[in-house]
Amino acid sequence: MPVIRTTEKPLGEGNRPDWCKVTSAGIFRVPAANGWFDLHYHDCDEYWLIYKGKAKVMSEGCEYYVKPGDIVCMQTGVEHDVLEVYEDLEAFWFEDATPPGGRTGHLHRDPSKAKKHPVPAKPLPADFPQ
């Protein structure tokens, strides 16, 4: 079984085993100081496994608080984003199989949203789940 060191290079075309159906996988970080992200969607399902930090994210038009141990599940075509962080956020992402004819990477309905935006660092809200 091969080992993909996603800390060095995300799993994707070129280092993905032939039998692997996952389109891509790796680690992303949004630091509390000078963090950036972009509103985007995919032609496949995507999952974020949060392992460090706390943040507010958006998916399906709804806002959610996330913390270590949470899995954010985004269906094909659903726009998602990181809205604000309360501490440095780190997560493992993977994009499920892309269907034939599907596109890979971050897709944007509005070209002006393709540019990353600053993610503000804010104090932890009182209603953040324990």
Label every PLM stretch briefly:
Residues 50-51, 58, 83, 92:
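Beta-strand residues in well-ordered beta-sheet regions across diverse protein folds
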Residues 61-76:
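Short acidic-glycine-tyrosine-enriched beta hairpin
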Residues 41-57:
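Short, conserved beta-strand element in jelly-roll/cupin
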